[in-house]
Amino acid sequence: MTRWTYTALAASIAFSIASPSVAFAKVKSTKKAAAPCVSESTMPALNVRALQTELMVAALSCGEAERYNAFVESRKDELLPYAKRLQATFKGRTNAFVTKVANNSSRNMDCVAAGSLFETVLSADHPQLETVASTDWASKRHGYRVCTKR
């Protein structure tokens, strides 16, 4: 071995002995962080936006642009208050929230299920969007929970 090799080896060993915490610093906690929370009155806005985003992703991924446009046009008066609530909650981060939901939707897109969802929201009996969106998949798409008081 050359003198340079011995020097590098000695420095490496000395560094390892002197700072054992470096070896452990990269170990991450196995505890999963709690999902962020919102007020109970805000949750329907998140769920409805998750529904709208699911349909938007289906429009792009499943060739459902015509039905998505029909949905937005027929439900714009119902969508608007939820959009305002979302903007009030997230302020300048609304686009980041919607992008996160869209990414989650695109990873799990099922065009057959999306087709059924379009049939539901465009049906003649016109169910409330809040009711349609109050399902487990909506909260899985946005990742929020209702805050609990301690």
For each predicted feature, which ranges?
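Sec/Tat signal peptide C-region and signal peptidase I cleavage site
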Residues: 19-25
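Bacterial N-terminal signal peptides that target proteins for export
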Residues: 1-9
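Bacterial N-terminal signal peptides
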Residues: 10-18
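Compact alpha-helical subdomains of small soluble proteins
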Residues: 76-150
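Compositionally biased, proline/threonine/alanine/serine-rich low-complexity intrinsically disordered stretches
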Residues: 25-36, 138, 145-150
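Short N-proximal segments of mature Sec-exported proteins
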Residues: 36-100
